[in-house]
Amino acid sequence: MLVSAKEMLDKALAGKYAVGQFNINNLEWTKSILLTAQEMHAPVILGVSEGAGKYMTGFETVAAMVKAMDKSLGITVPVALHLDHGTYEGCYKCIKAGFTSIMFDGSHYPIDENIKKTTELVNVAHNLGLSIEAEVGSIGGEEDGVIGMGECADPNECKAIADLGVDMLAAGIGNIHGKYPANWPGLSFETLAAVKEKIGDMPLVLHGGTGIPADMIQKAISLGVSKINVNTECQLSFADATRKYVEAGKDLEGKGFDPRKLLAPGCEAIKETVREKIDLFGSAGKA
């Protein structure tokens, strides 16, 4: 059964570990992540960007697939289905489709408008028992055409948004989506500590979890990060394993071209990446 992300993240904050949000793009991604979370007895959040939702023919298709797969696979660990970087309109579409958690990314609005829209969505989400994430300070890199420079959030703006009653807050601390450049200066723990001081006991979210060194991840968790988003790393490992399969000519052996065989190495690679992250985040055995 799908659940809101609130309880799992409150537990993570109290227990000083983080829950992984792994973005899904299709059936193979979803199945691989669910099976790995179950195997490791870890709570998990399935993230869906608006672009991925559109690719999978809409949020209703996504919700139906995830709910059916959760049941068919006999998954017993807590699973939240979460809209990632949602627009105002996208949030309402996901609420209607049956998602259990939403993220409203109002970081590109002036702070007053961000507050107004966030307040409205907090009330709607909480009335329906859903969790809601908000963002302050854009996350760098590109996510489905949304480009941010990786700025650091203003701790006072973070407090203003946190006070609206959101369940988790994504604060920009120099993190970016996608591959990190060689000259990346690292996470701003100074900003993270200042934000934490302002918002108190609220789970913080780290976007762009791919490529951040393990010691930085662990320090971020110790400072109150309770949800870490991973997407690019699963895509890279899937692509790498699939490329090796084809380059080795295995698609030409017998029925190696069957998509169930062709995609299997990529699925195993996703599972391995998810395993590594669950171990790093400390959420194994926490379901």
State where each predicted segment sits.
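Active-site proximal loops enriched in glycine and acidic residues that flank catalytic Cys/His/Asp
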Residues: 173, 208-210, 232
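Alpha/beta enzyme core
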Residues: 3-15, 27-52, 57-76, 85-202, ...
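Family-specific functional microsites
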Residues: 246, 263-273
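Metal-dependent phosphohydrolase cores
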Residues: 21, 213, 259
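Short catalytic-loop micro-motif centered on adjacent basic/acidic residues
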Residues: 19-23, 81-82, 103, 204-207, ...
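Hydrophobic alpha-helical scaffolding
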Residues: 23, 228, 232, 260-267
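Active-site gating loops and adjacent loop-to-helix segments of metal-dependent hydrolytic enzymes
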Residues: 247-258
